[in-house]
Amino acid sequence: MVPNANSNTVSLQSPNAIPPRTSSTGYITPFPPAKSVLRPVPESDWLGQNNTRNRSSSTTAIPLTGMHATGPQDPARYETEDLNYTSRKTWSEQKEKVLVGPFEYLFAHPGKDFRTLMVNSFNAWLEVPQESLDVITKVVGMLHTASLLVDDVEDNSLLRRGLPVAHSIFGTAQTINSANYVYFCALQELQKLKNPEAINVYTEELLNLHRGQGMDLFWRDTLTCPTEEEYLEMVGNKTGGLFRLAIKLMQAESGTPIDCVPLVNILGIIFQIQDDYRNLSSPEYGQNKGLCEDLTEGKFSFLIIHSIRSNPSNLQLLNILKQKTTDDEVKRYAVKYMEGTGSFEYTQKVISILVDRARKMTDELDNGRGKSVGIHKILDKLVV
């Protein structure tokens, strides 16, 4: 029977009164239960406390910035109200800053700007008009930064260029929205070229970028070790996508009939393999992104694939990837293991062979014109 809530004489048993302990055999402990240290609380009191608590919590709401009181509103105004806000251009600079906040945060802390260096080096051959080159350089920078925002979310990264990742500051949802917004801002910027081929290039390479990223994530999340050939295809889509985007846009705006895409494809592969190598060996890389971040991400990089496939019966490295460890000692052990399988030495040899191959392609494209200095400097930076 439920006590009358209006009665002031009905008391409830104190909540810390413990019943006799009964064993699994039904034996009841002979010791009397401890007396309550709390006095019985009348039901009207604890009901009143609950109401008070609800009232107090409702009056401590945090005020919203930019809010102000409005007078009574007539719902009939929606019969004639102009709801076409886009045509009235109500979008403000302040709202724009909200959207691009995560993008501008990362953009304000640039990396080594490898892509701008590449654009300028290839332009020695392609001789793109400066106005078009400015648009292309801006678009490539926007896409690169936006893609890094998404990468950091998908990889659960903590650091980017030695600073907290954008989604640790702005939140995951706002960061993803900002990156997606910038993808379309870049497309809008590209329309200034008034070149249909530029739009085709943009669409094709953005598709390739997401295809490569999708496979990279699939292997990580399903703990599936790809072959080297599958890895190279992924890199050609993911890393090579933005490289090709820049050069193919330049070719679309150039009057020089030269096809640089095969060379750019090789550069993209070298760049990614070299990045994988540095991730597991470079102290500078560790300071900017964390020690051996690929191991923490559970990523199947070039060295890790080689090491696992060198001895498939040993599951230690695969299990370390599965743990996505943040333990530095475990990561150092993994590096030692990969050294034992010859993966670092193998990667150095592959990079050396690919760099030599790229140099030969560069000299063939240059054909003695003396305009390949910038490309050779890029290749110098990719040697490990």
From Swiss-Prot:
- Note accompanying the cofactor annotation: Binds 3 Mg(2+) ions per subunit.
Residues that, per the record, bind isopentenyl diphosphate: 112, 115, 144, 161
Which CDD domains does the record match to this protein?
A: Trans_IPPS_HT
InterPro entries noted in UniProt: Isoprenoid_synthase_dom_sf, Polyprenyl_synt, Polyprenyl_synt_CS
UniProt binding sites for Mg(2+) 2: 151, 155
The cofactors it requires, by name, are: Mg(2+)
Compositionally biased tracts (Polar residues): 47-62
Question: Per the record's keyword annotation, is Metal-binding included, yes or no?
Answer: yes
Give me the reactions it catalyses: isopentenyl diphosphate + dimethylallyl diphosphate = (2E)-geranyl diphosphate + diphosphate; isopentenyl diphosphate + (2E)-geranyl diphosphate = (2E,6E)-farnesyl diphosphate + diphosphate; isopentenyl diphosphate + (2E,6E)-farnesyl diphosphate = (2E,6E,10E)-geranylgeranyl diphosphate + diphosphate
| Positions that bind Mg(2+) 1 | 151, 155
- Site residues by UniProt (Important for determining product chain length): 183
Q: Where is this region: Disordered?
A: 1-25, 39-78
Q: Does the record bear Transferase in its keywords?
A: yes
Q: Which SUPFAM superfamilies match?
A: Terpenoid synthases
This enzyme's EC code(s): 2.5.1.-, 2.5.1.1, 2.5.1.29, 2.5.1.10
Gene3D superfamilies assigned to the protein according to its UniProt record, in alphabetical order = Farnesyl Diphosphate Synthase
Q: What's the short name of a Pfam family annotated to this entry?
A: polyprenyl_synt
From the UniProt record, list the coiled-coil ranges. Answer: none
* One MF term in the entry's GO annotations: dimethylallyltranstransferase activity
The family note in this entry says: Belongs to the FPP/GGPP synthase family.
Protein name listed in UniProt: Geranylgeranyl pyrophosphate synthase
Task: Please report the organism this UniProt entry assigns to the protein.
Answer: Hypoxylon pulicicidum
| Gene designation | ggs1
